[in-house]
UniProtKB/Swiss-Prot annotation:
The lineage of its organism: Bacteria, Bacillati, Bacillota, Bacilli, Bacillales. It comes from Staphylococcus aureus. Residues 1-25 are annotated as: Disordered. This is Catalase-like protein. GO terms for cellular component: cytoplasm. PROSITE patterns: CATALASE_1, CATALASE_2, CATALASE_3. Catalytically inactive.
Length: 455
């Protein structure tokens, strides 16, 4: 049936006899409560807005394909990387961080760079940014960052002095602040920026050998940025500049691509590394740990419905596949709890059943039978009458010991260790970054800092 031939019904399929005129007591009388279509429409409308993401609320996304171009099987046995030429479906969501859903795309802000790969071993979520570092290295400060960069409780306005008051209390923030205030602080759009996993992760191979890795995604479109003046001009004419650019590029077949690289550090190198290799405020120098090409991803299909896919997509650092693992990075460890918890609040405990979040490479029928019930359990018959406990005598859903990860190295006693006593090398890397800038770029960094502090 064509769109023109469709007839209007309510959500339960009842024919709607009149779309324009409410049922009233007489032609000028009050409404009758038995106008079921009016009641249905208004009650649906009153509830259709779901909670906004606490960070990364304004986003754009697209489906695509990841392709392996180089062999890294000596580092990892993850099947997504098992052979050159292998392709995996994926979804990407890019975002600003501090702004709300209606924020302008061209604001000075970090950009979120979140990727979901639908592998045959489950979904792999890489929740990154367009910068390789962050403002701090302990997750206890994350709530305060949210408060500082969002709206002031008294004025309900965003306040640059709150930002600077917070940042200047954290000497380790200088690296991220330098990047944010540099020419790369405002990407021209989402296609012309790099992405980073930022955290240190680990990979392990068939022999159980573990290496630490950082992940990089370099745009094949080249880096393009905006000055403050250019950004202000764009915002004055349209707040959705990056979203429009990405959508229109994909619609006309100009598919954006990024090349994936890893940096690799052995466990022995990590023990002897000058700084804490798991410190999110620092990078690994490329001359010491060179970039190793892995593959590329291409975004080639726009969602048919923004809410269905871009708004409801749920990323969590806990979504990781065999062959990949975590690290002692404290910020990563904090995100292992926070992201999944936030998605369960925002979308419900069964948000994994939303199509964009389903583990397409595994099959919905093979999902854990011990997670049952909950609001909106709809797509898998709630596992029917199958066994929902373990151990059982039916031989169903046994563990898979072949997927056990190699032992995770730790040291020390549980204690609130003073991070500043462990590492106070705050200025070496931001200093090197600043000195790499052109004289004009250095001047712009200082001008932006002065302007924002006076704001």
């Amino acid at each position: 049936m064509s769109q023109q031939d469709k007839k209007l019904t309510g959500v339960f399929g009842h024919p709607v006899s009149d779309r324009e005129n409410s049922m009233t007591a007489g032609p000028r009388g009050p409404l009758l409560m038995q106008d079921i279509y009016f009641l249905e429409q208004m009650s649906q409308f009153d509830r259709e807005v779901i909670p906004e993401r606490r960070m990364h609320a304004k986003g754009s996304g697209a489906f695509g394909t990841f392709t392996v171009t180089k062999d890294i099987t000596k580092y990892t046995n993850a099947k997504i990387f098992s052979e050159i030429g292998k392709q995996t479906e994926m979804f990407a969501r890019f975002s600003t961080v501090a702004g709300e859903r209606g924020a302008a795309d061209a604001e000075s802000d970090i950009r979120g760079f979140a990727l979901k790969f639908y592998t045959e071993e489950g979904n792999w979520d890489l929740v990154g940014n367009n910068t390789p570092v962050f403002f701090f290295r302990d997750p206890k400060l994350f709530v305060s960052l949210n408060r500082a960069v969002k709206r002031d409780p008294r004025t309900n306005m965003r306040d640059a002095q709150n930002n600077w008051d917070f940042w200047t209390g954290l000497p380790e923030a200088l690296h991220q602040v330098t990047i944010l205030m540099s020419d790369r602080g405002i990407p021209k759009d989402l296609r012309h920026m790099h992405g980073f996993g930022s955290h240190t992760y680990s990979m392990y191979n068939d022999s159980g050998e573990r290496v630490w890795v950082k992940l990089h995604f370099r745009t094949q479109q080249g880096i393009e940025n905006l000055t403050d003046e250019e950004a202000a001009e764009i915002i004055a004419t349209g707040r959705d500049s990056s979203q429009r650019d990405l959508f229109e590029a994909i619609e006309k077949g100009d598919y954006p691509k990024w090349t994936m690289y890893i940096q690799v550090m052995t466990e022995e190198q990590a023990k002897n590394h000058k700084d804490n290799p798991f410190d999110l405020t620092k990078v690994w120098y490329h001359d010491e740990y060179p970039l190793i090409e892995v593959g590329e991803f291409e975004l080639n299909r726009n969602p048919d419905n923004y809410f269905m896919d871009v708004e409801q997509v749920a990323f969590a650092s806990t979504n990781i596949i065999p062959g990949l693992d975590f690290s002692p990075d404290k910020m990563l460890q904090g995100r292992l709890f926070s992201y999944g918890d936030a998605q369960r609040y925002r979308l419900g405990v069964n948000h994994w059943q939303i199509p964009v979040n389903q583990p397409k490479g595994v099959g919905i029928e093979n999902i854990c039978p011990f997670s049952r019930d909950g609001q909106m359990r709809v797509v898998d018959n709630n596992q029917g009458g199958g066994t929902h406990y373990y151990p059982n005598n039916h031989g169903k859903f046994d563990s898979q010991p072949e997927y056990k990860k190699p032992p995770f190295p730790t040291d020390g006693y549980g204690y609130e260790y003073n991070q500043r006593q462990d590492d106070d090398n705050y200025f070496e890397q931001p200093g090197k970054l600043f000195r790499l800038q052109s004289e004009g770029a250095k001047e712009r960094i200082l001008q932006i800092q002065q302007m924002q502090w006076k704001a």
